[in-house]
Amino acid sequence: MKTGCAAGSPGNEWIFFSSDERNTRSRKTMSNRALQRSAVLSAFVLLRAVTGFSGDGKAIWDKKQYVSPVNPSQLFLYDTFPKNFSWGVGTGAFQVEGSWKTDGRGPSIWDRYVYSHLRGVNGTDRSTDSYIFLEKDLLALDFLGVSFYQFSISWPRLFPNGTVAAVNAQGLRYYRALLDSLVLRNIEPIVTLYHWDLPLTLQEEYGGWKNATMIDLFNDYATYCFQTFGDRVKYWITIHNPYLVAWHGFGTGMHAPGEKGNLTAVYTVGHNLIKAHSKVWHNYDKNFRPHQKGWLSITLGSHWIEPNRTDNMEDVINCQHSMSSVLGWFANPIHGDGDYPEFMKTGAMIPEFSEAEKEEVRGTADFFAFSFGPNNFRPSNTVVKMGQNVSLNLRQVLNWIKLEYDDPQILISENGWFTDSYIKTEDTTAIYMMKNFLNQVLQAIKFDEIRVFGYTAWTLLDGFEWQDAYTTRRGLFYVDFNSEQKERKPKSSAHYYKQIIQDNGFPLKESTPDMKGRFPCDFSWGVTESVLKPEFTVSSPQFTDPHLYVWNVTGNRLLYRVEGVRLKTRPSQCTDYVSIKKRVEMLAKMKVTHYQFALDWTSILPTGNLSKVNRQVLRYYRCVVSEGLKLGVFPMVTLYHPTHSHLGLPLPLLSSGGWLNMNTAKAFQDYAELCFRELGDLVKLWITINEPNRLSDMYNRTSNDTYRAAHNLMIAHAQVWHLYDRQYRPVQHGAVSLSLHCDWAEPANPFVDSHWKAAERFLQFEIAWFADPLFKTGDYPSVMKEYIASKNQRGLSSSVLPRFTAKESRLVKGTVDFYALNHFTTRFVIHKQLNTNRSVADRDVQFLQDITRLSSPSRLAVTPWGVRKLLAWIRRNYRDRDIYITANGIDDLALEDDQIRKYYLEKYVQEALKAYLIDKVKIKGYYAFKLTEEKSKPRFGFFTSDFRAKSSVQFYSKLISSSGLPAENRSPACGQPAEDTDCTICSFLVEKKPLIFFGCCFISTLAVLLSITVFHHQKRRKFQKARNLQNIPLKKGHSRVFS
């Protein structure tokens, strides 16, 4: 999709493999029959709306304590797991063993279900055949380097009719060989007794798990396994995910035995499964634990759910009920108080535990075995209601378990996601899902103190995926089911998991540790603006209007002109523009040394030629520059800055074909000369065109239009550069370049060679496309020319790159005085063969979103180390040139405390500092993007559209004052005072200076008037007193004396 950013801000077409899309894709893989079954559950879901119970886990949704997205506890954690952490991988017998009719194995309920319910699936003989190719499985385990292997015993392979009366010798031999091989390799076996493949005989004879007789039969089977294998097995799982056994086996019909619509059966089966597990645990605890010293649990699975509004208690309670009705259904009796959650017991369908049974059931697990995978999220309408959202947040559900069940030790006994069946070894999305899940586990251990002691990646091999049969794959190893030898080929996810195991987590590799240091004192610290819209008339007409006005204070309070009176006026001044005054105040707050903005070509030359020049607009821009220089802020001026919504060309030029017409290049030269002549004495840094490698995207009707427009843009830039070099540089002593959009590219899958090539190809098509002709060879990159030619030969493209004539090659080569780049993010690319008539298809590149990385609201990934790699790549390919980062920033929706932007600035400046100090890249300036924001665009601005400063303003100004990231005890930078503290009162005085001046004048005048009034009042009293004395009669012999 297209982002809503301008050409100066990041915007492109993205492919997002988000969790929501993955859920959608998972639902699409289900058969129509399975989807229809889900409709039966509409009545069941109503039961979950009952209120009454509120467990401790409900606190997990209380987000009143806001946690910043850039808080270390919320970011991807580069750290390692505890030293004794266990790494494993798992399989299910029915999924991988195959050979369902071989060596005496009896049929299971799933064998019948496959043939009766799953159309087009010819049994499990297409499976991985682990029963036959045991050695290949062991080699796969050796490749990964796991410390344990979790597998299940096939009950019908060991006991074909389900009872322990007659063991199948061949099946017994297979499991003994497997266990012996694991012990020999020092791989700990974790054995699951029941992973859904119930012997068919028990289903037909007893009705399966609906019959309580299964409790004793299961205990007999478990006892035999303990006796036979217990000397080599220290970890036992009784049942894998009983919720799915009960709910999908007897409620939705999505699993064997395929019964549906009977809630009584659903809860009866769940009840019997809990009691069966409990009986086996007590059996092991009493009879086998004393000498085998093992541990036993049951694997419980769940989804995770989030309320739409955490301040809506009803939504929160419904989320709690949703978790309790899935995970709590089994966890509460076993890990809790021995009984079902209270709100579930309000219905008459669920069985009751007697007090003795509660005591029997409670505490029958030595650790909490937890499953978190796609089966727990299907179908979505069984776990999601109005006001809720499904989430793949494994960390949160682990916290919920900790709160609900008294901080148990946890083994993640199943975790992973799926890919479509056509994916072979390049399972790139599976890598990111694993990375996300594993890091959430690490965060839970490190930040939340959750006691996770092991992780089971699911699954070792591609195999039968239950209701999805063979339409999805979950294995770390690819298996061609139609081949005879069933070779195990490691997928990218296998390589990745192997690396995780070797590193014991996520040690920091992508970047060196943070460092302290400064940029030089002449470093340009700037801020970038897009097109600066001019004021066509002065905002304040004070002293420019010759008329005198009287304010009618008693009537309508309007101003009335006094006829016949004319006042002396003065010419308008730069300070008369209110917008300039506001802009200068913003620049002063930021303490920048440079300000980059773009001129509006359409306003300066509305007709596109010199026949009509808007001098008022030129004067406005000159005022912007001059007022900034008074403040010590130097300009970098862009002549032409198109955006996605506006090409920025005068209408006559646009009507005549725009950049597809070479006349536009001539018009651009005339326009540039006018700007050099009118503003060049004040401007020393010029950008001709902003992001021409993105502007060409506007001419995307065909790839040839794109390449032609880009070619003409390059010619236009070169002509302007030569014009400046010849006529204006000797006098104005400035520098001219153009700015390129330069995002870095990384292979989305580092284990696939084609992704590495795609990443380099992206850089060639995106950056070298313009950089090679201008900085290097005078011609397009050879990689670009050869790749397009190759696609043409194969009929996959009709693109034709324009050719530079010898004259044009000489014209464009070397027409840059510095390297100006706009960098925003790092793209993770995959090779994808495309066949359209658009230029982007010539790259054969698509993007993948790394869900583990901090991203902005517009999905820009925060990958600071990418800018350092980019700078090193530029230095390596285009020699040691002066480089200006002319735009670097991110969108942040916060109107005041924009924490993502502050984090972004700090980390990207950190990486630029490393490039300068360690890699010796000649970085001359850093310009943050951008000064102000527009109401209709993502919020990239330091100031809001009504000029209110965000907290990033002060943060960036401190970076500038420190000239980087110095150590705390270092001396002040570049003549700065020892303490550069933020003076709130000083800022207020500066901002309110006119009002304060007026107030002082008013108070002074008031004081003078008051003094005069008091003086005259006292004088009058003296005079009155004197007159009174004259009227008093004198005594005889006295005379009046007047002084």
Curated annotation (Swiss-Prot):
Residues carrying a glycan: N84, N122, N161, N211, N262, N308, N389, N552, N609, N700, N704, N837
Protein family membership: Belongs to the glycosyl hydrolase 1 family. Klotho subfamily.
Glycosyl hydrolase-1 1 as annotated region, ranges: 77-506
GO molecular function, one term: fibroblast growth factor binding
Primary subcellular site in the record, as a coarse category: membrane
GO cellular component, one term: membrane
Organism whose genome encodes this protein: Mus musculus
Subunit (UniProt): Interacts with FGF19; this interaction is direct. Interacts (via C-terminus) with FGF21; this interaction is direct. Interacts with FGFR1 and FGFR4.
Domain of life: Eukaryota
Expressing tissues: Present in liver, muscle and white adipose tissue, but not in kidney (at protein level). Expressed in liver and pancreas, and at lower levels in skin, stomach, skeletal muscle, small intestine and lung.
Domain remark text: Contains 2 glycosyl hydrolase 1 regions. However, the first region lacks the essential Glu active site residue at position 241, and the second one lacks the essential Glu active site residue at position 887. These domains are therefore predicted to be inactive.
Keywords: Cell membrane, Glycoprotein, Membrane, Repeat, Transmembrane, Transmembrane helix
Disruption phenotype: Mice are viable and fertile, but have an altered bile metabolism: they have increased CYP7A1 levels, secrete more bile acids and are resistant to cholesterol gallstone formation.
Chain residue ranges for the region called Glycosyl hydrolase-1 2: 515-965
Database matches in InterPro entries: Glyco_hydro_1, Glyco_hydro_1_N_CS, Glycoside_hydrolase_SF
Transmembrane segments: 995-1015
This protein's name: Beta-klotho
Annotated localization: Cell membrane
Residue ranges annotated as Cytoplasmic topological domain: 1016-1043
Membrane topology: Single-pass type III membrane protein
Topology, Extracellular side: 1-994
